[in-house]
């Protein structure tokens, strides 16, 4: 047996259990800002729709995720958890969950080896394996398919949180390698158009400012990618007064960016002039070593896509003559042989979680309410192999659960108006193919 599997079945591994009370107080605060999850607890109180579910979870171990985990357990599930990023864990959140009796394996600053060890620990429920997977980014899903394929026969479904993981699911499906039905939570409107857009609009600038104390007003910023995450990122910087330039491969997204007032160029057109570079593409090698060498002295480089492949960090770290100096955790200055330096945040990983605390609780309530509904749906109903999205009526339900807290009063159709539009009186109000 490997050193990893010899240690399987541990109850938890966190950085500092003494932080549990701090974490618990922040969880209580977050619950007030997460009306969707709290409403599901009330709706299913006593019904336990996840009784018997053994959920292996891999998702950023934050305060907001703690509220998700405790919602799953209140609905009857048994849960084991790891983070999906080596820097994203909030140690007080992990401590609070461990203290509450949920097996959690996560701490900020894991090594790559520790990261995969933590993921493996989510798979051992005594003498049983998981029968559900809740994933963010696809690492847990891929790990089970590659390392523990025997567990797949017991797994009823996978719910995937983010764009990168969804791409991976569709790739597996296309190649005939996906063995379990999955829900694409990311493409729920109340996830992608809220978490990806409005969440990034607040959390990107938060991460950059906490890391560097830089004033964004007047700076020239380059945002690579103008999908939902890129749209939120560009708005985040613009709202603080930065002049934002966008790169895109997609003519539709490029046209959207231009009509929002952003200049759309190629990286090589502008890299020498920008003060801040943010990657938000979900792709590889967006910022190359050559780009980094061409950047202004003191420029800031960061990523808000799921993985660290968007910036060529391995080439930067191995380049002869380049020196690295840690300014503080997750803030590193790289100096080139010509004397110029750049500041790289979170080692090229998610800057909003590596250098700050991620998205606000309210918008994560939208995302995580989708996750809970997907888990209930997959656990209680048998799906054929495929990748599915939540039906429109559940998407609208997620939105509705968050309106009262914002003081929203919905207009109600009468029957004549509903008939005229050709929609049910109480929704869904849009066809499945409607683009918000």
Swiss-Prot record:
Pathway assigned to this chain's UniProt record: Amino-acid biosynthesis; L-homocysteine biosynthesis; L-homocysteine from S-adenosyl-L-homocysteine: step 1/1
Cellular component GO terms, alphabetical: cytosol
GO BP terms, alphabetized: L-homocysteine biosynthetic process; one-carbon metabolic process; S-adenosylmethionine cycle
Enzyme class label: hydrolase
Domain of life where this protein originates: Bacteria
Locations listed in the record: Cytoplasm
SMART domains per record: AdoHcyase, AdoHcyase_NAD
Names of the cofactor(s): NAD(+)
A single MF term (Gene Ontology): adenosylhomocysteinase activity
Enzyme Commission number, as recorded: 3.13.2.1
Catalysed conversion reaction: S-adenosyl-L-homocysteine + H2O = L-homocysteine + adenosine
Annotated cofactor note: Binds 1 NAD(+) per subunit.
Pfam families in the record: AdoHcyase, AdoHcyase_NAD
Record PROSITE patterns: ADOHCYASE_1 (PS00738), ADOHCYASE_2 (PS00739)
UniProt keyword list: Cytoplasm, Hydrolase, NAD, One-carbon metabolism
Amino-acid positions noted as binding NAD(+) in the UniProt annotation, renumbered to this chain: 162-164, 196, 225-230, 248, 283, 304-306, 352
InterPro entries: Adenosylhomocyst_ase-like_sf (IPR042172), Adenosylhomocysteinase-like (IPR000043), Ado_hCys_hydrolase_NAD-bd (IPR015878), NAD(P)-bd_dom_sf (IPR036291), S-Ado-L-homoCys_hydrolase_CS (IPR020082)
Residues that coordinate or bind substrate: 62, 136, 161, 191, 195
Biological role stated in the UniProt entry: May play a key role in the regulation of the intracellular concentration of adenosylhomocysteine.
Family: Belongs to the adenosylhomocysteinase family.
Name of protein: Adenosylhomocysteinase
Organism (species): Leptospira borgpetersenii serovar Hardjo-bovis (strain JB197)
Underlying gene: ahcY
């Amino acid at each position: 047996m490997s050193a990893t599997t010899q240690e399987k079945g541990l109850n938890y591994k966190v950085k500092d259990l003494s932080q549990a009370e701090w974490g618990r107080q922040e969880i209580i605060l977050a619950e007030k800002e997460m009306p969707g999850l709290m409403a599901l607890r009330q709706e299913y109180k006593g019904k336990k729709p996840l009784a018997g579910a053994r959920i292996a979870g891999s998702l950023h171990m934050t305060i907001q995720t703690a509220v998700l985990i405790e919602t799953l357990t209140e609905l009857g599930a048994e849960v084991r958890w790891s983070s999906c990023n080596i820097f994203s864990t909030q140690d007080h959140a992990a401590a609070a969950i461990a203290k509450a009796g949920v097996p959690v394996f996560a701490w900020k600053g894991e090594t790559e080896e520790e990261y995969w060890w933590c993921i493996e620990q989510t798979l051992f429920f005594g003498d049983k394996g998981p029968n559900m997977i809740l994933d963010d980014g696809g690492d847990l899903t891929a790990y089970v398919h590659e390392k523990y394929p025997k567990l797949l026969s017991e797994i009823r479904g996978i719910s995937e949180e983010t764009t990168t993981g969804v791409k991976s699911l569709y790739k597996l499906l296309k190649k005939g390698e996906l063995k379990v039905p999955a829900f694409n939570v990311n493409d729920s409107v109340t996830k992608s158009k809220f978490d990806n857009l409005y969440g990034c609009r607040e959390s990107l600038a938060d991460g950059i400012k906490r890391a560097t104390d830089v004033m964004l007003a007047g700076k020239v910023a380059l945002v690579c990618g103008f999908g939902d995450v890129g749209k939120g990122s560009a708005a985040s910087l613009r709202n603080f007064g930065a002049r934002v330039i966008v790169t895109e491969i997609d003519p539709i997204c490029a046209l959207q960016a231009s009509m929002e007032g952003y200049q759309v160029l190629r990286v090589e057109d502008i890299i020498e002039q920008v003060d801040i570079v943010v990657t938000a593409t979900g792709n590889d090698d967006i910022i190359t070593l050559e780009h980094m060498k061409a950047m202004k002295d003191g420029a800031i480089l960061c990523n808000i896509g799921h993985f660290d492949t968007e910036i060529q960090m391995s080439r930067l770290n191995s380049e002869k003559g380049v020196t690295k100096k840690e300014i503080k955790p997750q803030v590193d200055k790289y100096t080139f042989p010509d004397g110029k330096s750049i500041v790289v945040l979170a080692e090229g990983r998610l800057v909003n979680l590596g250098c700050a605390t991620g998205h606000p609780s309210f918008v994560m309530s939208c995302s995580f309410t989708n996750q809970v509904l997907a888990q209930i749906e997959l656990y209680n109903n048998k799906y054929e192999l495929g990748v599915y999205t939540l039906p429109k009526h559940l998407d609208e339900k997620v939105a509705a659960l968050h309106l009262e807290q914002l003081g929203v009063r919905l207009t109600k159709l009468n029957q004549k108006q509903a008939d005229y539009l050709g929609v049910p009186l109480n929704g869904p109000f849009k066809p499945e193919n409607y683009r918000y």
